[in-house]
Amino acid sequence: MDFKQHITIVENFPKEGIRFKDITTLMQNGEVYKRAIDEMARFAKEKEVDLVVGPEARGFVVGCPIAYAIGKGFVPVRKAGKLPREVISVDYGLEYGKDRLTIHRDAIQKGQRVLIADDLLATGGTIEATVQMVEQLGGEVVGIAFMIELGYLNGRDKLVTYDVFSLTTYE
């Protein structure tokens, strides 16, 4: 299936010169959304994952249905101050500064096989920080799955030691 035909390109959002890839139109079509999740879930099953981890916020709308489809748990990665129990955190760079991601300290057990799922691979900063936290907790990142990859931003270069799956790529 050509998923690109179900993704809306929004010009100059969130700022001038950006061509934003909006997955909400894909998600509004139940058949297409199911097909996308099914393909990502197939990748997760092949990797024999124990848990799916997704970064805030669109990683939730990708990761949760994958976890459900394969009968595994889901672990959210949130921005600082959003999780109620003891966390570990990692700072990561943005084009305009820094931000911090957190995960519950007890979310992943040593040796668990983890799939990280998100909507978009751009520069790779968010996923790189997520990988770092999963590994710090003793998890093994066995795969990383995206709905969209922006190949021209070379985010995959930060993930060369991981098995990366993308439904569709924009070059």
Swiss-Prot record:
Signal peptide (residue range): none
Per UniProt, the keywords (alphabetical) are: Cytoplasm, Glycosyltransferase, Purine salvage, Transferase
Write one Pfam family the protein is assigned to: Pribosyltran
Q: Which GO terms describe its biological process?
A: adenine salvage; AMP salvage; purine ribonucleoside salvage
Query: If you read the UniProt record, what top EC class would you report for this enzyme, in one word?
Result: transferase
Which GO-annotated molecular functions does the record name? adenine binding; adenine phosphoribosyltransferase activity; AMP binding
Subcellular locations according to the entry? Cytoplasm
In which family does this protein belong, per the annotation? Belongs to the purine/pyrimidine phosphoribosyltransferase family.
NCBIfam families in the record, alphabetically?
apt, PRK02304.1-2, PRK02304.1-3, PRK02304.1-5
Q: PANTHER family, per this entry?
A: ADENINE PHOSPHORIBOSYLTRANSFERASE
Q: Could you tell me what this protein is called?
A: Adenine phosphoribosyltransferase
Tell me what gene encodes this. Answer: apt
